[in-house]
Amino acid sequence: MAKNANRVKIGLKCSECGDINYTTYKNNKNTANKIELKKYCPRLKKHTVHKEIKLK
C-alpha cells in the first residue's frame, strides 16, 4: 500500500508544563488549522489544553 501524502505525524504539547505527551496523525487536507485538545497531563495529574506541534 502507498503512504498517504496528506497525513502528517504531529505531537500534542501540554500548554502548562511543555511536555509532549501524545503523538497522532493529522490529515492536512481536511484539517488545515492547528489542533487544540483538552487531554490528561500525567506530570500535572490533571486535564490541560494540548496544542499541536511538528515532530522532526
UniProtKB/Swiss-Prot annotation:
Pfam family, one: Ribosomal_L33
GO molecular function, one term: structural constituent of ribosome
Keywords: Ribonucleoprotein, Ribosomal protein
InterPro entries: Ribosomal_bL33, Ribosomal_bL33_CS, Ribosomal_bL33_sf, Ribosomal_zn-bd
Membrane-crossing residue ranges in chain numbering: none
Gene3D superfamilies documented for this protein: Ribosomal protein L33 (2.20.28.120)
Biological process according to GO: translation
Cellular component terms per the entry's GO annotation: cytoplasm; ribonucleoprotein complex; ribosome
Protein family according to the UniProt entry: Belongs to the bacterial ribosomal protein bL33 family.
Protein name as annotated: Large ribosomal subunit protein bL33
Protein encoded by which gene: rpmG
